[in-house]
C-alpha cells in the first residue's frame, strides 16, 4: 500500500500527505486504517486485500494533522507516564555501574516478545476503550508496563503498578482484544 501511496503522490496528487520511512516494517510510522483495519502501509500488500477498492484513513483515536497524518503526541505522552526505562533503587549504581546486569535466557524470554513493539500506535487506534475514554492509558502503555515489570534488571515494579492501578489504567481495559 505504501508504494501505491508514493505512486499517487508522485504521479497523481502531489498534495497527498502521509508518513513513511523504513519501507520494511521496522519504524511503524506508516500506520493507517486500511479497509477498516489498522495496519502498517509498508507491510500491507494490495493483492492480499482481495478487493478492487482500498479505503485509507488516518489512525483512529489520535488528532488529525492532515490527510493521513495524525499527531502521535498523546500516544507518546501516555507511554511516557509508565516510565519506559529501567528503574534501579541504587542511583549511584545506576549512573556509575560497577557490573553488567546479566540475565539468564529464561529471564530474558519473560519479556522478550514485548520488547519488539514498534510504537506504531496500531493497537491504540484499534482500542475501543481508547476511543471512548481519552484518559485511558492505552494498550501499548499497558504492554510496555509489563515489559519492564517482567525484566529482572528493573526495580520499578511497585512504582509502575501504582501508575496503572486505576480506572484509566489496567482496570479501564474492557478486554475487547482489538489491540492484538
Could you tell me what each predicted segment is?
Residues 1-11, 57-180:
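Ferredoxin-type iron-sulfur electron-transfer modules in oxidoreductases and energy-metabolism complexes
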Residues 45-46:
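A generic structural motif
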Residues 49-53:
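Extracellular interaction modules
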Residues 33-36:
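Short strand-turn-strand beta-turns centered on an Asx-Gly dipeptide
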Amino acid at each position: 500500500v505504501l508504494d501505491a501511496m508514493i505512486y499517487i503522490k508522485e504521479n497523481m496528487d502531489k498534495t497527498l500527505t502521509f508518513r513513511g520511512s523504513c519501507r520494511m516494517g521496522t519504524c511503524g510510522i506508516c500506520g493507517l486504517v486500511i479497509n477498516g483495519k489498522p495496519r502498517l502501509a509498508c507491510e500491507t500488500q494490495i493483492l492480499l486485500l482481495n478487493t478492487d477498492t482500498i479505503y485509507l484513513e488516518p489512525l483512529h483515536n489520535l488528532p488529525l494533522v492532515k490527510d493521513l497524518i495524525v499527531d502521535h503526541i498523546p500516544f507518546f505522552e501516555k507511554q511516557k507516564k509508565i516510565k519506559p526505562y529501567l528503574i534501579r533503587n541504587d542511583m549511584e549504581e545506576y549512573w556509575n555501574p560497577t557490573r553488567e546486569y546479566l540475565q539468564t535466557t529464561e529471564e530474558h524470554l519473560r519479556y522478550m516478545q514485548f520488547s519488539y513493539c514498534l510504537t506504531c500506535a496500531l493497537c491504540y487506534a484499534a482500542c475501543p476503550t481508547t476511543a471512548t475514554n481519552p484518559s485511558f492509558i492505552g494498550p501499548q502503555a499497558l504492554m510496555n508496563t509489563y515489559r519492564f515489570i517482567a525484566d529482572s534488571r528493573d526495580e520499578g515494579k511497585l512504582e509502575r503498578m501504582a501508575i496503572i492501578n486505576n480506572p484509566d489504567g489496567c482496570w479501564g481495559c474492557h478486554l475487547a482484544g482489538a489491540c492484538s
